[in-house]
């Protein structure tokens, strides 16, 4: 099953050699969906269902009192949807501001990419990945494998949330104590998954350069690979240009 997931993912990673194309297409897809909603039309795609909650979130708060609350998948979806809606609100506001300043729509759109539409698109992507992963896991019969996959899903969700805790802290959507709980739960999940990681990596088989583990090469030649990296580094066997500074000179 994991192999099928990987094969399906690999061909969708880039488009025309540039991920920014996908980011901009995603932003346009979401804003078009919002326009339909604001006109009272039906939102055509289920992946945009979070737009039904697009509103002023200034008074909204999430209740996280203990670490087990962070294992609640519905709560994680709620938080990821909140983040996407908040970033969408900021993006729409920024876009409207640029247009009011007599910038053309094209220039206003480009000026709203960094920190706004790009962040919103990535947030939507992570929400979409979370929901797809969850729906697939729910089809699996209860087993140790399912438990591990759920832990990975929760870890993914919390890691995504942790990157934007400053955003979640706006208007006290989450408390400072909840931020500590998020970080602690990430550490607990990493500890719990430690014994399963070798099996997981064997199944997914990411390329060594993607994994980035200095001692975790897939061919098993740990020290040979490490030395090859050193020996192949540019200038490895050349005398450094500052050698004379350290060279002992006769007086």
Labelled PLM ranges:
Residues 1-251:
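Flavin-dependent oxidoreductase catalytic core characteristic
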